[in-house]
């Protein structure tokens, strides 16, 4: 009976979970660009997510319009990806280590931007684009509606961009760097550009989350890479058989983030210890990452052996 009583509270919490999932889904799309397209494990996102939130909040507190604050936050995120890309390509530092170095530096930079560990912003005093307060309202300014529109714009722009010659060059760089260089493609430039675009999206997500929750925190991006990977993997696991178009693959990542946050909300509603959420997330990501390896190791060989036996017969 206690479980049923707790589950009765779940519908009231679902709008908030969906809104958060959509916001983090934009960040997950950024992770998808580096993880699946560039084939680079970029850990900058844990820092650039907070940078987007910090820059957006400080711009709003200084009197800047929200429509001007968001592009500034996006440019700040783009700059963080640019730094990681240059550390990797120009200085020869491995991509993972380059991301860690940038992430570490961004902790101090985010502190310097805000002047302290966190900065709050009041929805009554500032014209925010989204807010937690409106999540259950049936109106255009509902965060769910606004972020769906933002996600649609992001997916549309990325679909167009990766269909251009430059975008195809980035995809080719991630798919086969050696062949791309042989075709005269500047792979270093494409890696830097891909990382910059990815972290620009991550910063946009951070800027939206800071408005939604009403504050920016220096540690708000901690564990973002795990959430991003979880969204990518869940989206692929659920929709990979039916979503083959590039735009639909990006949409599946966003839906994966929503599923992730709904599951998290369900687990919390059932009384799971909130202190163990990061452990749960890491375990889920580890298992899903291992599934392709397990499939190849334990399920492919018997099929090949059966085919060989049939040929010999």
Tell what function each PLM region has.
Residues 64-104, 109, 149-152, 255-256, ...:
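Alpha-helical transmembrane segments within multi-pass membrane transporters and channels
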Residues 1-27, 55, 63-68, 140-141:
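Membrane-interfacial amphipathic/re-entrant helices at transmembrane-helix boundaries
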Residues 175-182, 186-189, 248-251, 261-313:
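Cytosolic-side transmembrane-helix boundaries in multi-pass membrane proteins
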Residues 35-90, 133-140, 242, 269:
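Membrane-embedded helix boundary and interhelical linker motif in transport proteins
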Residues 95, 99, 103-163, 193, ...:
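Transmembrane helix-bundle core of multi-pass membrane transporters
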Residues 202, 206-278:
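Transmembrane alpha-helical segments in multi-pass inner-membrane proteins
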Residues 80, 140-225:
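Helix-loop-helix "hairpin" substructures at the membrane interface of multi-pass membrane proteins
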Residues 36-41, 82-125, 214-218, 230-251:
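Short loop segments and helix-boundary regions at transmembrane helix junctions
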């Amino acid at each position: 009976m206690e479980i049923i009583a707790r589950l009765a509270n779940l519908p009231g919490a679902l709008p908030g979970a969906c809104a958060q999932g959509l916001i983090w889904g934009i960040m997950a799309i950024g992770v998808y660009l580096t993880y699946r397209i560039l084939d680079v494990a970029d850990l900058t996102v844990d820092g650039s997510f907070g940078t987007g939130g910090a820059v957006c909040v400080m711009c709003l507190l200084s009197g800047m319009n929200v429509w001007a604050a968001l592009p500034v936050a996006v440019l700040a995120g783009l700059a963080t990806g640019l730094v990681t890309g240059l550390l990797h390509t120009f200085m020869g530092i491995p991509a993972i280590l380059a991301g860690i170095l940038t992430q570490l530096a961004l902790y101090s930079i985010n502190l310097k931007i805000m002047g302290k560990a966190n900065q709050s912003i009041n929805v009554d005093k500032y014209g925010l684009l989204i807010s937690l307060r409106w999540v259950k309202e049936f109106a255009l300014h509902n965060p769910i509606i606004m972020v769906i529109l933002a996600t649609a714009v992001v997916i549309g722009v990325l679909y167009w961009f990766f269909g251009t010659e430059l975008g195809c060059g980035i995809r080719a760089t991630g798919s086969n760097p050696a062949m791309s260089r042989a075709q005269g493609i500047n792979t270093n430039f494409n890696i830097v550009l891909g990382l910059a675009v990815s972290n620009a999206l991550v910063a946009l997500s951070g800027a939206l989350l800071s408005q939604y929750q009403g504050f920016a925190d220096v540690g708000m991006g901690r564990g973002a890479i795990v959430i991003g990977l979880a969204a990518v993997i869940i989206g692929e696991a659920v929709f990979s058989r039916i979503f083959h178009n590039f735009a639909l693959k990006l949409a599946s990542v966003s839906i994966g983030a929503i599923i992730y946050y709904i599951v998290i909300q369900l687990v919390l509603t059932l009384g799971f210890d909130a202190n163990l959420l990061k452990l749960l997330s890491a375990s889920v990501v580890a298992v899903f990452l291992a599934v392709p390896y397990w499939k190849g190791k334990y399920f492919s060989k018997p099929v090949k052996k059966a085919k060989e036996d049939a040929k010999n017969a």
